[in-house]
Amino acid sequence: MPYERLKNARRVVVKVGSNVVTAHNSLNTNAIQSITYQICMLIDRGLEVLLVSSGALAAGLRRLGLDRRPDEIPQRQAIAAVGQSGLIKAYEAAFGGWNALLTWKVVPIINENDTVMVEEIKLGDNDNLSAMIALLMDADFLINLTDIDGLYTKDPRRWPDAELIPEVSVFKKEIETFASSIPGALGTGGMLSKIRAAKKVTSAGVPMIIAKGDKPDILIRLMDGEKHGTYFVPKSERMASRKCWIAYTLKPKGRLILDDGAVQALIHHGKSLLPIGIVDVEGEFDVGAAVEFADTAQEKLGIGLVNYTASDIRAIKGLKTLQIKERLGFKPYDEVIHRDNLVVTPP
């Protein structure tokens, strides 16, 4: 049974949404106390817990008397700065009450709403961040706590006939359609960003659960194997940390368009990418850059680290490996992307 796997977990990432830790124009200290208590109970069992907490931006908005998140980056930075200190202080105070259980233990508290790193706020959200942390830290599970019970067929806050989807094993288009109908409130995510996070971790072999954060002892009950929320089934094979890093943390600097033969070789046979299978090169990049590859219909298939510059790949595209030195005057590698540096990602 899927939930039984939680009993054997040794390291979990817990992501807590804005609507779980904020209420009535301020931080919800009762919710934070409950979450920290549960984390302490899990640590006392021998688990390692990494906490990704939203709430800084929402806490700042409410503290300043604002009811919507502005689009302008400087304003979002200022609001996050106002809320971040209060959020961390609240967690510090809550964890301080459980020192007997946390003797010399550390719970990393991670938040994407940084006041300095513009790109972090501009492009990221804590759902995506929690997925990256789960992959890079070799977590056994990602638990995403929000203000509804899981993924529904439509927004249950508006539609009484909405049905909970207890398990997702295949990401059909209708899954994103369901998620798109369930927006977030003050947070940056909403259900769609959670589904995208689930795609990432499950494709790398890590299961994820979306559950209601204010259910009594929800973390403890999940770790005891109880069924709650929506369970996202992982692929059976675990992706290596290095490939997770390539697939989900590096920004692509360009794109390679591949013919059908190369697509089949990479996706179905786990081969390296050779120049003969490349039909076009987009962008400018150097050796070692992360570059996407796609089919002739421009559908992204994956990402990898290139052994040649963009200009060199343009010169050798469509050629056999034996012709590389003849065209360039040198041949450090047979492959444009070696299979060890290549990751096929889900659509």
Which residue stretches match the model-derived regions?
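C-terminal catalytic "cap/lid" subdomain
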Residues: 1-69, 73-347
